[in-house]
A protein has these predicted regions:
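Single-stranded nucleic acid-binding surfaces, predominantly the OB-fold ssDNA-binding core
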Residues: 1-183
Length: 183
C-alpha cells in the first residue's frame, strides 16, 4: 500500500502575507526529495478536496496532492489552472469599500469518476462576469491557492480555523488549463 505524509508549505504573496496550503505527498516521492523545514521547494500537483465528517476542524478539507517535488530557487510562485463546472449558484456581494466579490464552488473532475469541489473567489469585473453564470456552466481559470484564518463560533466557545480557496486571477479558454497547481 502507498503511504502518504502531509506538511504545510509557506508561500509568500507580493503583499508580504503568507498562504500556507497543506501538501500531501507519497513517502516514495519524499524519499526522492526529502523535505526540511524552511527549505525552498517547487511542487507540481492537483488541488484536492474531501468532506471531513469527524466533526473536528473544517468540514471541507483542501490539500495539494504533490505529483512532483524538487528543490526550489528561493522565489515564491503560486499558480493554479482549473477547469470545471459551477455546482452552486455564484454569490455576488460587495466589500465594505464597494468592491465586487463573487464566491463559487467549482466541481473539477478527476480519474475514476471522482470530483473535487473547490471554493473559488473572484474580484471586480471577473466577479460580475461569473455572477451571471448558471449552475452546470463550464469555467476555466487561472488563480492561486489562498489561505485565510477565521474564528468559528462554537457552543463551547470559539476556535481559530483556516479556510483554503482559489483566488481567481483571470478566466481562460478551457484548452489553456491543465488542472495543475504550481507552488
Amino acid at each position: 500500500t502507498r503511504r502518504f505524509d502531509k506538511f504545510p508549505l509557506r508561500v509568500e504573496r507580493l503583499s508580504g502575507q503568507n498562504d500556507v496550503p497543506v501538501i500531501v505527498a507519497s513517502e516514495a516521492l519524499l524519499r526522492v526529495c526529502p523535505v526540511e523545514e524552511g527549505q525552498s521547494l517547487r511542487i507540481v500537483g492537483q488541488l484536492r478536496s474531501f468532506n471531513n465528517r469527524s466533526g473536528q476542524g473544517n468540514r471541507l478539507v483542501i490539500t495539494v496532492f504533490a505529483q512532483s517535488i524538487e528543490p526550489g530557487d528561493g522565489s515564491y510562485f503560486n499558480r493554479i489552472l482549473l477547469s470545471g463546472a459551477l455546482c452552486k449558484k455564484p454569490v455576488l456581494r460587495r466589500t465594505p469599500l464597494g468592491r465586487s466579490i463573487c464566491d463559487v464552488i467549482l466541481a473539477v473532475n478527476r480519474h475514476y469518476g471522482r470530483a473535487d469541489y473547490l471554493p473559488c473567489i473572484a474580484w471586480g469585473q471577473t466577479a460580475v462576469q461569473i455572477a451571471g453564470m448558471d449552475v452546470g456552466e463550464r469555467l476555466a481559470l487561472e488563480g492561486r491557492v489562498q489561505s485565510r484564518t477565521y474564528t468559528k463560533l462554537l457552543e463551547s466557545g470559539s476556535e481559530e480555523r483556516t479556510a483554503f480557496e482559489v483566488s481567481i486571477m483571470q478566466l481562460l479558454d478551457e484548452e489553456e488549463t491543465e488542472e495543475t497547481a504550481l507552488l
